[in-house]
A protein has these predicted regions:
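C-terminal motif of bacterial Sec signal peptides marking the signal peptidase cleavage site
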Residues: 18-20
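Amphipathic alpha-helical repeat scaffolds of TPR domains
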Residues: 61-69, 95-110, 136-156, 180-201, ...
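Solenoid-like repeat scaffolds
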Residues: 91, 175-177, 222-224, 254-261, ...
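TPR/TPR-like (Sel1-like) alpha-helical repeat modules
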Residues: 97, 104, 108, 118-135, ...
Length: 563
C-alpha cells in the first residue's frame, strides 16, 4: 500500500485527518492509559483472525486475546488497528510488559512505510514502559523486549538507518538464542526486509542484500509451522519478484483462507497468482479481501481508521482491476477501476509534494477505457485542470487513442503534439509514484504508444515498431510493482502491430516473451495463436485451447491482443 512502495503508507500517513481517524495519544505519565484516551482509540475485538498465540504474562484474562489480536494485525500490516489492540491490552493490564512492547513495535518502519518522525516519542516512551516492567515477565518476553530496545533512541538521528541495522542485528541474535521460537525468526526476516524494502533482486533477478537469508529464514519457519501467517505473508513478498515466483504458490494457497478477517492477508496470494498466471485466483483473492475490508470498516461504523483504508483497501480494488483486465472481464474491470479512482480522488492531496502518485491511481478509470476500447466514454471526458501535468498528459493520450480508433487522425496528431512536451518535461521526473519511480515513465510510454498507433494507422509499420520498442524499454525499466507501473503490457500492442504488418514470426517472439513475463494472460495467448496460424504452425491449436481456458471468465471477444 504497496511502496507503493505498492501503496506507500509513509506518504499516506499524512492524511490521517482526512480519514476521520483518531490516533492513539502518547502514553500517559502514569502507568495506565486513561479511559478517555482508550475511548478515543476505538479498539474492537475482531473475528476471523486465526488462532496464532504468543503467551504473555498478564493478570487479566482478556488481555491475552487483545495481545494475540494485535500481533496478528501486525502480521497483516494493519498497524493502526494493531496499535489500538495493544493499547487496549495495556489499559486492561498496565503492568503487562509485552502490551507496551507491541504498542511500541508497530510505530516502527516496515516494508511499506518509513517511520513517521512524529512517532519517535511515543515509540520510545512505550519501549521504556516495557523495559521497566520486563523483570516481571517471562524469559521469552524479556528477550523480545531487549531486541526491540535496539530499534529506537530517545533522540533519534535524522537518518535512522543505523537504528534499523541495529534492530536487525538484535533480532538475529534473538533468533540465534531461541532457534525454536518461530515468531523470533519471523521478526528477524521482517527486520532484514525493512533494510531493503521492495529491493530484493537485481536486474538479473538474483537475490541481493539480505534476501537469501530472508528466504531461508522464512522457509525454515514454514517447514516447522506451515500455517504461520506472518511467515507466509512475508514469504510472498520475498519471492514474488524473483525468477521463480512459483515457489510462493503453496504459501499463497495456505494464506488465502487462513485469516479470513484480515483483508490484506486474504489479498496477498494475488501477488503470487498474478506472477504465475492464475489470473482468476487473483480476481477471487481480491474480491474476498474487499469483502473482508468492507466488514472491518462497517464494524468501525464510519470511523475509518488510519492509513489502512487509504492504502491497503484501494490497493485491493486496483489489483482486482488489473487481474480482471488480464482475464478479459471487462464489466468487472470497469467497476473495480471506478472504485479505485473514487478512493484515490483526493484532489487537494494529489497536488502536494510527495503525493503525485495519487494522480496515477485516480486515472485508473481512464486507463480502463483505453484498455477496453470505450472510445465514446473517453471523448466525453473534459480537459483536466492545467496544474496537473501528468493528468493532462494521460488525458491527451486517452483522447489520441480514441481519435486513432475512430479514424480521426488529425485530432490524434493534435493531441500527440500536446502530449510530447509534457512527457519530455524534466519536471515530470520529479513526480514520483510513492518515492519509487517517476510518473514520467508512464507519460513517455503513453507518448511512444500514440506515436506508434498513428504510424500503424498510416501503414508506417517500421516506425510503429520502433516507437513501441522504445516504449518497451521504458516499461521494462520500471521497478517491480504489483500492479505494474503501466496499465497494459506494451508488448500486447507491438505484437498486434507486427501481425498487422504481416510479420507473424516477429510477433510470435514478442508474445512468447510477454507470456514469460505475464504467464497465462489471454491477450498474449490470443496473439500467439494468431501468429502461429499465420505461419501455418500446428502449435496454434494447442495455444488456442490455452487461450479459451484463460478467457473462460471474459465478456469480450478480442480481434487482436489490444483493442
Amino acid at each position: 500500500m504497496t511502496k507503493f512502495r505498492p501503496l506507500s503508507l509513509a506518504c499516506l500517513a499524512a492524511v490521517l485527518a482526512l480519514a476521520a481517524c483518531d490516533r492513539a495519544a502518547p502514553p500517559a505519565a502514569t502507568p495506565a492509559v486513561s479511559p478517555p484516551e482508550m475511548a478515543m482509540i476505538g479498539a474492537h475485538l475482531l473475528e476471523g483472525l486465526g488462532d496464532h498465540h504468543f503467551a504473555i504474562t498478564t493478570t487479566h484474562p482478556e488481555v491475552q486475546r487483545w495481545f494475540d489480536q494485535g500481533l496478528m494485525l501486525t502480521y497483516g500490516f494493519n498497524h493502526d488497528a494493531a496499535e489500538r489492540s495493544f493499547l487496549k491490552a495495556a489499559e486492561l493490564d498496565p503492568q503487562c510488559a509485552m502490551c507496551w512492547w507491541g504498542a511500541s513495535l508497530v510505530l516502527g518502519p516496515h516494508v511499506n512505510a518509513t517511520m513517521d518522525p512524529a512517532d519517535n516519542a511515543d515509540a520510545w516512551q512505550r519501549l521504556q514502559r516495557a523495559r521497566s516492567l520486563a523483570p516481571n515477565a517471562s524469559e521469552r518476553e524479556q528477550a523480545f523486549i531487549e531486541a526491540l530496545s535496539a530499534r529506537y533512541a530517545e533522540q533519534p538521528p535524522e537518518d535512522r538507518r543505523a537504528l534499523d541495522e541495529a534492530y536487525a542485528a538484535a533480532t538475529r541474535e534473538l533468533a540465534r538464542k531461541r532457534p525454536d521460537d518461530l515468531d523470533a525468526a519471523v521478526f528477524l526476516a521482517e527486520a532484514l526486509m525493512d533494510l531493503q524494502p521492495w529491493d530484493y533482486y537485481d536486474a538479473q533477478l538474483q537475490p541481493k542484500g539480505h534476501t537469501a537469508e530472508v528466504v531461508q529464514t522464512l522457509e525454515s519457519v514454514m517447514a516447522r509451522h506451515p500455517d504461520h501467517a506472518g511467515a507466509l505473508h512475508l514469504y510472498v513478498h520475498a519471492v514474488e519478484a524473483s525468477a521463480d515466483p512459483q515457489r510462493g504458490a503453496d504459501a499463497a494457497d495456505r494464506l488465502r483462507t487462513l485469516v479470513p478477517g484480515s483483508g490484506h492477508l486474504v489479498h496477498m496470494p494475488a501477488h503470487i497468482y498474478a506472477r504465475v498466471g492464475r489470473w482468476h485466483d487473483a480476481v477471487v483473492a481480491n474480491q474476498r479481501a474487499i469483502e473482508a475490508d468492507d466488514a472491518y470498516l462497517a464494524l468501525c461504523r464510519g470511523n475509518v481508521q488510519g492509513v489502512y483504508p487509504l492504502g491497503y483497501v484501494p490497493h485491493n480494488h486496483h489489483f482486482l482491476w488489473f487481474a480482471a483486465s488480464m482475464e478479459g472481464n471487462g464489466a468487472l474491470a470497469k467497476a473495480s477501476a471506478a472504485a479505485t479512482s473514487e478512493r484515490a480522488d483526493l484532489q487537494e492531496l494529489m497536488r502536494q509534494p510527495g503525493f503525485a502518485g495519487l494522480q496515477h491511481y485516480w486515472l485508473t478509470g481512464w486507463f480502463d477505457r483505453v484498455r477496453f476500447g470505450r472510445w465514446d466514454e473517453i471523448v466525453g471526458v473534459p480537459n483536466p485542470a492545467p496544474d496537473l501535468p501528468y493528468v493532462t498528459a494521460i488525458w491527451h493520450y486517452a483522447q489520441a487513442m480514441a481519435a486513432v480508433r475512430q479514424d480521426r487522425l488529425a485530432d490524434a496528431d493534435a493531441h500527440l503534439a500536446k502530449l510530447r512536451p509534457l512527457a519530455a518535461d524534466p519536471a515530470m521526473d520529479q513526480l514520483l509514484v510513492w518515492d519509487r519511480y517517476p510518473l514520467a515513465h508512464a507519460a513517455r510510454i503513453a507518448e511512444r504508444t500514440v506515436t506508434a498507433e498513428l504510424a500503424a494507422a498510416r501503414g508506417q509499420f517500421d516506425d510503429a515498431a520502433a516507437a513501441l520498442g522504445e516504449g518497451i524499454a521504458i516499461e521494462d525499466a520500471i521497478p517491480y510493482d504489483e500492479p505494474p507501473g503501466w496499465h497494459a503490457p506494451v508488448r500486447h500492442t507491438l505484437g498486434a502491430v507486427l501481425l498487422q504488418a504481416g510479420r507473424p514470426a516477429e510477433a510470435e517472439a514478442v508474445y512468447r516473451e510477454e507470456l514469460r513475463r505475464n504467464p497465462g494472460n489471454g491477450w498474449s495467448l490470443f496473439g500467439l495463436a494468431r501468429s502461429l496460424e499465420a505461419q501455418g504452425k500446428p502449435e496454434a491449436v494447442q495455444v488456442q485451447a490455452r487461450f479459451a481456458e484463460a478467457w473462460r471468465n471474459a465478456d469480450i471477444r478480442p480481434t487482436a491482443s489490444r483493442i
